[in-house]
Amino acid sequence: MNTIGGYFVENLANCKCKKDSMIIGNKYRISILTERLVRLEYNPKGVFEDRPTQRVIYRNFPKVNYTATQSETLLQVITSYFTLDYVKEHTFAGSKIAPSTNLKITLNGTDRTWNYNHPEARNYGTITYSLDNFRGKLKLDKGLYSTDGFACIDDSDSLVLNEKGMFQNRSDKVLDLYVFMYKKDLGLCLQDYYKLTGYPLMIPRYALGNWWYKDSTYTNQDIYKLVKKFAEEEIPLSVFLLGNKWHKENDYYTFNDKIIDPLKLKKFLDSKQIKLGLTINPSSNIYQNTETYNAIAPSLSQDNQLNFLPVNNNKLNLYTYNVINKLINGGVDIFNIDYNNKGDKLTSSLFNQYHYVAEVTTLNKRSVVLTRNHNVAIHRYGIVVTGKTIVDWETLAILPRYNYSASNMGISYVANAIGGYYKGIEDFELFIRYIQLGVFSPMLILASDDGEYYRREPWRWDISQREIIKKYLNLRNKLIPYLYTEAYLYHTSGSPIIQPLYYEYPKIYDEPLYINQYFFGSQMLVCPITKKKNMIMDRVVQRLFIPNGTWYELESGKKYLGNKYYMSFYRDEDYPVFCREGSIIVMSLDKNTDNPVNLEVDIFPGSNGNYTLYEDDGITDSFKNGAAAITEYIYNYSKNTYELIIEPKAYQGLVPPIRSYKIKFRNTNSASITVSDGVKNIKATASLEKNDLIINIPSVASSSKIIITCTGNELENSTIRLINDDIKGILEDLEIETILKEKIDKILFGDLPIRKKRIEIRKLKRKGLEPKFIKMFLNLLEYIKTV
């Protein structure tokens, strides 16, 4: 089936609910889809919809155990999760005074009830349409997650898919609601939602790398020069996304003359393993005597200018064949749809769906579309862009919470303009905090408006700053094996890649100092820095909440005991990311997004661990037929013996035949090492690097099992994080006389009570200690006091 519907709906029969799960009246139909999910339809004409919609593509859920009791006027339905009471044939809406008069759904075992038009005020919210020009307080849209334990999705206005596989308006004005009654089982709610609307896309592997977007006018030579500069700086780049200035002035769908040969450009980018993307606005006018006009005018009414809006099936087909396919055949890999119309989300959804399907069917490759959030099952095909955000700290401060709130609607791929898009003041500290957030987010796009003074190019900062940027953009590329595995888990199990702490720790929702923290995949915790540093100590004072268990800082390896609050200090080059005890982080040491030849595997002590690395060709759907490589990493931990087993479990033809490994046992002392395949030894070398034990295995067959055993007396070294160490580091970096530093050290870390320490610090003014330093050390004493 070559239609858009045929791509998303494999079997139309699955769009119809089972007969014995439906209760049908003259004007209503109630479908019990799962024990937590009920569909409510009301149509005075008594006609109900079994076709798929833009949002809903599956209703053939297994039969649910429920009881239905009814009289001539009343209906009651009971499942293990909810009890529904309905006055038959009445509209679902009650009066303003008694809104649940006609319909009420109660969560069993609670006093919480849902009714039509319920405000759902305790909903945690999800991402909005965009953050274009954001200012002020963040207001989120309604998501699925609520402390009430219920949420409703209104599908009444969605287009339906007809028998020809094309979308059309509904014939009647109806109510078509899906009510999720899940108590505290958000994970099960998301499973119901994904089955109803489709599971998330499997993102192409290249999309997880570093993107470049600057809305400038480029020539071929400009692009060649920029790409080569990234290579010279040893900064990986995976996508080059053109802004709104790639097309002709009077033809918004044809390359301008500055890009002389798009296919030649495409060939160059392919040679550098970089994908080409375009920004496109499907609402742009089409003017007479242009290439696009001449192609579509015979099929539309003649006019001096044409437009694909308002959309209909004829226009969408013309758009597909004369715009999308033309550009795909011209070398375009990705589309950024800049149809910025918050009031017309259904049209935005249509364009996204047509772009996605056209690319998949034309190139026989996985597709991905960038778009603002129309919130119509966008998890199936889209990367949500937050829009043209302002370059400032205020915007950065709301991004972590905004990004992870997407998970409350089953969405993972949210892309911010890293650095901010426009306006504001270019500032390195702000820029690096944006980059660090991007590294530990599902997407990273260096982006800005056109303008000479927007500095997104890493080499335009001074040398020390450039090295920090380079460090993090390379770290992003290193993390791709981990990210791609987490993306696969999201695609198959529906577990969002980033998740707020309040899923496990509801109290965090009401603690503004910690609300921005989130889990990044299954192994990491991120505590984003979104405020300016203290210029005197040259560090940010960051408050942290560490969850249950033992956690280790990703970079330093410092140990943090869980279920505790901390205060730490971070320089520009530092970022608070933590790994659980027993975590195994598999990373790439190559400078591209391919399945790596050279891997680094970081293992954190404290408990047993395992991780299943997933790899495939990164671009096609062949993985659906089993074309994938699965490698198990198993870590057996004891006080005096560490064992790591690397065991290939599935098809290995998609990975390099020979691989090299850098195994990094974090916080580990010197040990006796053996490396084997279980039968014979494998050549390897061992060394100590800072607090870590490094084992290098130069080359081994990817199909080989590897067993690494470390034995010694108390292998884990003591790296418990101490605030005194942080403060000593601050003191060491300050430009203060060394003799004064010694006096300050004795005061800060001596046995005097805090009150007397304050007095002694103030006395140092007589010794020449400047007031700004006195104030800083008094504040540090307060920090010590609170820890």
Predicted ranges, named:
Residues 8, 33-72:
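A low-complexity, Ser/Thr/Gly/Pro-enriched, surface-exposed linker/loop concept
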Residues 68-207, 214-216, 227-232, 504, ...:
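Catalytic and substrate-binding clefts that recognize carbohydrates or anionic sugar/phosphate headgroups
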Residues 582-787:
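C-terminal low-complexity, glycine/proline- and small-hydrophobic-enriched intrinsically disordered tails
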Residues 30, 38-42, 77-84, 525-528, ...:
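Short, well-ordered beta-strand segments enriched in hydrophobic/aromatic residues
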Residues 133-134, 213-259:
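A conserved hydrophobic secondary-structure block that centers on an alpha-helix together
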Residues 51-65, 553-572, 673-697:
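Solvent-exposed beta-strand/loop surfaces of large extracellular or lumenal domains
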Residues 367, 377-384, 399-402, 406-416, ...:
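Catalytic core of carbohydrate-active enzymes
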Residues 106, 110, 117, 236-469, ...:
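Aromatic- and carboxylate-enriched substrate-binding clefts and catalytic-loop regions
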